[in-house]
């Protein structure tokens, strides 16, 4: 099962909504899901305003329907990387402030999500490392052949939401509609994401139960095999 994170030889599909998403069969993804109240409206509005000002300074209007294409055509690869890194950093900083109800701070919501993620491992995906933060989730996963990320995402966000809501006796929207995914390009990126997942609670200054974090042995083995080859 030690498939490479990304292959230059295989086809890549790209589509856009609020974010740009890359897809490739057999690849590994870093994914972030956020609880519906994880980011207060004033923070998301400020974040979007800062993005708009940053792009406007580079001659790109975020009001344009094609602004993401403009980013790719007008900015160098390095500028694109730095832009995305900076605004992802700002967003994650706000997430780590633990806004909202923070259902995953304690059981039963935390245990329900963790158990279901592990239960579906190797039937719907190959589950890599994960960290269940109080109001968001970071995880690495590799898709089983024939399954795409959209269907897998729908199962995690839809089916898991039902179980978590049931466990904590609530109803209504659990997750934010938009989510973040990144197709892991190489072993260096994979190591960086694994380190980020492991270090997230300490850097955020949040103490979590042990079962909030999981390190996947198959990823460790895959990296070891990669270094030996």
Model region roles, listed by residue range:
Residues 1-229:
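Short catalytic/metal-binding and nucleic-acid-binding patches
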């Amino acid at each position: 099962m030690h498939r490479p994170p990304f292959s230059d030889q295989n086809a890549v599909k790209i589509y856009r909504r609020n974010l740009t998403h890359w897809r490739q069969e057999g690849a590994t993804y870093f994914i972030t899901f956020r609880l519906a109240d994880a980011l207060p409206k004033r923070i998301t509005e400020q974040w979007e305003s800062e993005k708009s000002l940053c792009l406007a300074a580079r001659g790109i209007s975020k009001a344009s329907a094609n602004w993401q294409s403009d980013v790719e055509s007008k900015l160098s690869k390095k500028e694109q990387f730095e832009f995305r890194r900076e605004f992802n950093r700002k967003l994650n900083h706000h997430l780590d402030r633990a806004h909202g109800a923070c259902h995953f701070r304690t059981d039963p919501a935390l245990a329900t999500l963790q158990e279901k993620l592990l239960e579906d491992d190797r039937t719907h995906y190959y589950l890599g490392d994960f960290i269940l933060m109080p109001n968001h989730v970071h995880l690495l996963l590799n898709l089983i052949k024939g399954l795409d990320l959209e269907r897998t995402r729908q199962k995690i966000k839809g089916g898991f939401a039902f179980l978590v809501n049931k466990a904590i006796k609530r109803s209504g929207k659990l997750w934010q509609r938009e989510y973040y995914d990144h197709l892991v390009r190489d072993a260096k990126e994979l190591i960086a994401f694994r380190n980020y997942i492991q270090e997230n609670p300490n850097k955020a200054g949040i103490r979590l139960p042990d079962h909030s974090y999981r390190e996947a042995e198959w990823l460790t083995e895959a990296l070891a095999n990669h270094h030996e080859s």
